[in-house]
Amino acid sequence: MFETQKFIDDCREALKETSAHAAVKEIVAKSVAEPTQVLKALGEPKLAGIQTLYRSDRLTILNVLWGPCMFLYPHDHRMWAVIGIYGGREENAFYRRGENGLTNAGSKTLDTRDVIPLGESVIHSVTNPLETITAAIHVYGGDFFATPRSEWDPKTYQERPFDVEAALRVFEESNQRLRANDTDR
């Protein structure tokens, strides 16, 4: 059974491990292996958004809800991360820094129950290819909101400082489409 506070406590305890990243990956994998339990604890997603479950200078735990067909442009985290999907699908495109911006470096599709660890230098973009909300637990080895990061223009791949407000607008635009689709029915 997934209990939010126990999950948070387990992740905090994992920070004491020699390889905290690997320890957190195991905790996330165990949790998303029972997606209905996570849904029961965190609630059925109705809208896109980012819910902060825990935040400190060493650890951030988010419930990330990607709206239908939502795309978030290339960005980095500058800390390790573990992503676990408990509903839907997340397509990650990976990039490398180049002299003229980014170059493509592969992709990985995550489905319900899938988990992926991301190193602190990873640059990726995220797409929810489905017509439904994708739900994921994201755990970061630091303060996700206070760490200076970068984003890249999705067309030119030119680097710029990460704009949290712009990222949140992407979620809000997705919610506007969701609401419009609800009124069309």
Where are these regions (language model features)?
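A short beta-loop-beta micro-motif enriched in histidine and acidic residues
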Residues: 55-59, 68-82, 103
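Glycine- and acidic-residue-biased ligand/ion/polar-headgroup-sensing regions
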Residues: 77-97
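A short glycine-rich, His/Asp/Glu-containing loop-to-beta-strand
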Residues: 39-70
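Short acidic-glycine-tyrosine-enriched beta hairpin
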Residues: 97-124
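N-terminal leader/capping segments at the start of a protein or of a new domain
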Residues: 1-37
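Double-stranded beta-helix
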Residues: 131-182
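Short beta-strand His + acidic residue motifs that chelate non-heme Fe in jelly-roll/DSBH
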Residues: 73-74, 92-93, 118, 124-130, ...
